[in-house]
Amino acid sequence: MPERINKLQPNRTLHLRGFDNLGAAAALHSATADSFEVSGVFRDPADFAVLILHDMDNFYEHPRLKHLPDSDFDGLTLTFDVRFEGLMTLDSPKFPTIDWPYLDVIRDDATSSTAQIPLSAPGRFIQVGGTQTAATATFTIVNNGLQQFDRLVLWYLNFNFDYLVEQPVECLYGFVGAGAGTVHRITVAGVDYTHTESLADTNTSIALALIAALGTSPQVTATQDTGAANQIIIRAALDDHAPVTVSSSSSATAFTLYGIGAGTVAASLATRINALDWVGLGVLMPLTATSTGATLTIASQKTGVDGNMLTVYAVPKNSRLTTTAPQVTLSGAVSDAIWRVTLDFAALGVPKIRQMWFTYAPALANSARLTSTEWRAIYSNFALTGPDAKQQLLVAGLDSVRVEQNDVWCTYSGIWADELGFFSSGYARRANAIGAKVTVHYACATTHDLYLGTSIYSDRANANIRLDGDTSTVLNCHLASLTAVNTRRRVRTGVPAGEHIVTIEVATPGFFYFDFLEAVVATSVPDPPPARLDLSPALDYSTDHTYKLSPARLMWNFDRLGFAGPMNEYIGVFWWNQRQRIGATIPAVTVTFAGTYVPGDAVFVNIGGQAIGKSVFPNESNALIARHFAYYINATYVGVWAAAVGGTLVIESRSPMPAYAFTFNAFAETVAGSTGSVTTVGALNTGVPGTWQVDPAQSPALNRGAQDWHRDFYTECHLRSRPIVTACSMELVNPPMEFVARFPDGAPVITSVGFGSLNSAHCSFAAPMRNYQKAVYLSIANLMAEVGLVPQLQLGEFLWWFFSNQTSSGGGMAYYDDETQALALAALGRPLHTFVQPTDDPAINAGADAVFLRNRLRDHAAAIIAHVQATHPAAKFELLFPYDVNHPTPAGVFHLGGALNRFINLPAEWETKPGSGFDTLKMEALDFGAWSRNLDLAKMAIRLPLDLGWPKASVRYLVPVFRPYSAWEQEYLLAVGEGIPFINLWAFDHVCLYGLRLQTPNQSPRAQASD
């Protein structure tokens, strides 16, 4: 049945844009029609990942499945629920160093204008589940006999909440005997407390008697003055801040005392905190406070874990009024909510969308360096509402007609040049002169829309389009973009069935690309072609068409394209590894506060142009000033963190990446009598990013993103009963140097991977690499077994490096890592012979040196197989053997191979299945098929295992399709003709990008020709 797909459908249209740095990893997985998950690991605060929700110019699918460009979101609304783990939360008020709080949009308009839509804005963001709490902390106020003018100051950022005991809380009266019968009196709130003097009384006894009398007063306490025995200290007893009048017969002076205790102080401080105009002052994380007795509870007004970064500290004048702790850090906040987000695209000002995406960033480490953090973003109830016709994405149906740039139906005038690239069939034609023209004849049996396949970019020319001589229209191919986009644009609608002529003429300066013309009969996704049980494209996890897609979308592609044969995945050389950073320098500055600061001084720290300060109050030490800035920085900044020890403050950039480089300055503004000073050492703009090196110590060997993706991928395979073999090779990007193979001059084997500036290293068969590969293969086997698969693993191109650096002085073949040389010396009784090139004679020294090397390869593979099968006895292993670089004599356009390569890279035990340790042998000869285009050589590769005695049922073949116009269909037919049961195409991305034919090819007389 045809299948309808929709915009923003998680298992059909979403994909990763990618993630930043080799230390990071991300995966889109567990996708259904209304849910999905993105997960991974971040190891640096500068790491981020991007999920593309919509791209009107679909890069991924084969033309049979690739949806037509559609930017219309007018009248559509997206609603979803989401929960984050280990990420910056959507509701965090922190400054966004990357766009994690937003939906980013590029509009489909003339200027490709952009929009940033806050996801947590009121009205579109509500909590529907989970837990979301605020951080709190408590101060206990201590009254150790506080006196008038005692002081307690709480500091948060540079806000002080200052409590001064302004009213008297006690008074003193002295009593002197005046003769028997004299009535001595103290009056409290109108109540007299008396003692009638006797003949036996002394001044002291009179005072003690009055103290005893006052013991019944609820409003005051009375104690004997330790300095004068006849004096009474009277203190307000209630902690209610209420006045009480006290007078005495011994003095004409009356006092009004106030009931000030720890509770009064706590309540007053709470009032001060709550009275601050937090909003007007623009405070990022405002506070609120309550008091119960002597306990002052301070809470973040905002919920979420950012509150756990806040510290409030206390500065008492003396020990009479203080707190049990000198500072409190708020804690207990939880950010584990499920948020519902609603996005009405038209109301948000984005009715036409070319691209939109979410960004993920690591949660901010609290007052510390970020450690490796695994993370998840879990989406559910992901639903688009609005008119059905606008929700649906259409494809060019089976009645559509595509005319390629090199078809006979195209006539060119002017200067045009072919350009190789990710175009339909692998080529497009380019012109850069006004007036260059292509005329295309085509016929379509159905009413259709007309699309032009082209390339849009910032330097592209416009073209005038005419259909059957109608009025010319302009196709604008300019796009403000960092990279060119190969896509299609609609140039006519509702074209009637029949034959037509289209002229396309370059109209403005710049480059114009003609890829194809397509008469599109728009439909839902068509039924798949007949399933091909012997064939499937191979996957390379390193490529966009694998790691950026969810397994659900990937397997849907295979299903709808009719690829039902056993699958082959190469895990690649970089995205899956656990890594550690080496050679990095994280910038830091040390600030020392010295001398003696006095009230009225002000101290400032300026980081990246953002200044924070400290107003100096009484009793504030240099250590306290340092702590103040540490608390302030850790509560506020996202680019740095700080720690204080004594009077020294250390501020460190959170990352050595350029985005985290900041200017820095610290200074003091002092008043008369101050000797305070500030000195700084270091800088915050001297970071060295270092290298993200493979870390063999981490377990499991696959990072979180690769684990989650493969677990889901293997689940999808298991649901289809689809065999899958996963391969590793001897190449890694940034491995530990003890892994790397060496030429005789000690130079490492380094080769380009074709992705940016990354290079991979070919590794040796040394113990460190072997132990690492044991862990890797076991991790993969565990994931397969976890979902119910029998593990099937491939040793992909397990070879000694097949090229020489003989052009270098002391160069040769890459057999000379330290371990191999040491073991050769022990085994041969002499140094290993220096082999110079692949064509060297392996029989030198009676073949002892070459046999030693060959057996090292054999034993390396056997050790890995034994290690995995100790845990998974039923695990199956496949060898992928590249015959082009191991041909016994140089062959093909690049003259690959040689006797030495052939001898050492295919151990004698592997030439037949019994005793090889392998269940299947897969042959490849990428050069012979894709570059040399020599079917005779390809046939030799196909036949090699058969000629050696391997049973056909255990042989597989890998056909290269990565070069346009190679004779891949004929190579496939050769393999079928030899009885090879299962064939893979290298690789899936090229099948889609070039739009390769899906039908089973027919045998033709050209099958033996080098097409």
Describe these PLM feature segments.
Residues 564, 568-584, 689-856, 882-893, ...:
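Aromatic-lined carbohydrate-binding surfaces of glycoside hydrolases
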Residues 392-526:
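Glycan-recognition surfaces in beta-rich domains, encompassing non-catalytic CBMs
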Residues 59-97, 341-362, 382, 446-450:
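Extra-cytoplasmic beta-strand recognition segments
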Residues 111-129, 336-347, 471-498, 507-509, ...:
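Extracellular carbohydrate recognition and processing domains
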Residues 86-130, 339, 387, 454-475:
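Extracellular ligand-binding interfaces
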Residues 35-72, 337-340, 424-445, 460-462, ...:
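Short beta-strands within extracellular/lumenal beta-sheet-rich domains
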Residues 551-559, 564-566, 570-575, 727, ...:
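Glycoside hydrolase catalytic-domain groove-lining segments
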Residues 124-131, 138-336, 450, 586-670, ...:
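Extended, beta-strand-rich, solvent-exposed assembly scaffolds of outer structural proteins
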